[in-house]
Amino acid sequence: MNILITGGSSDIAQAIAKRRSESGDKIIITCSNDTSLNKTLAIYRQQNIEVTGFIYNFSDPQACENDLELILKEPLDGIIFNAFTRVTQLRKLHALPYHAVRAYLDNNLNGNIWLIHRLLPSLLKNKFGRLVLISSLSAAAGTSRYPVYCAAKAALEGLFLNLAVDYSANNILSNIVRVGLIKTSRTEQFWKNPAYQEKVMQIIPQGTMGEPTQVAEAIDPLLSKTSFMTGSVLTVSGGLPLMRSEGLLS
């Protein structure tokens, strides 16, 4: 299969790329700028993972048009929508400047939707496609001080459910993977804190945070050529939002 993974520099993207590459898939990644792309490709080479990549920036998605034209000369079988802007200001909604709220929504919604819109005609022509949104428990649980992130993820989940309804008869299947607390570079400020780790172990039903490799493993059936899953929401979270009550009461 030819697999496109957006946000290719993330730990989850790297785990997916490694797993799928070992299965014989051709992997294409995106990064938001030259520096990130070159650094990320070097990381993949160090791990002996064969990938190609191009720049895809939410603020100017059309700039990647020439790269997409080249990529689409071969059928694109699966797209993992993993790219998302990092949250830098943990505040309640009223404390965020509205221009920042609007910019975040514009980038993350329009950036992802533009790519879906651009790729659908090719998928329809090939009568095959596997679309996977890497979402978050925050889309349903409303994580504190992540108002715009929660809104954007929930909006994309709604779109993916619509895609499942409208395109599954064309063998274009759309599914959502909601991840919980995963050990990545974005969350290391939390999981490297012993006190946080102890509390997490008391609350998460499985008693531990997840690994990027576990997210990658969960995606396999969603990319299958014989899959009968569409419009599904797969939760990779160790049991969250279910919680162990002794952890809450301790």
Show where each model-derived region lies.
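Catalytic Tyr-X3-Lys loop
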Residues: 94-113, 132, 156, 206
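Short, small/polar-rich loop/turn modules that mediate ligand/substrate recognition or access, typified
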Residues: 168, 173, 229-231
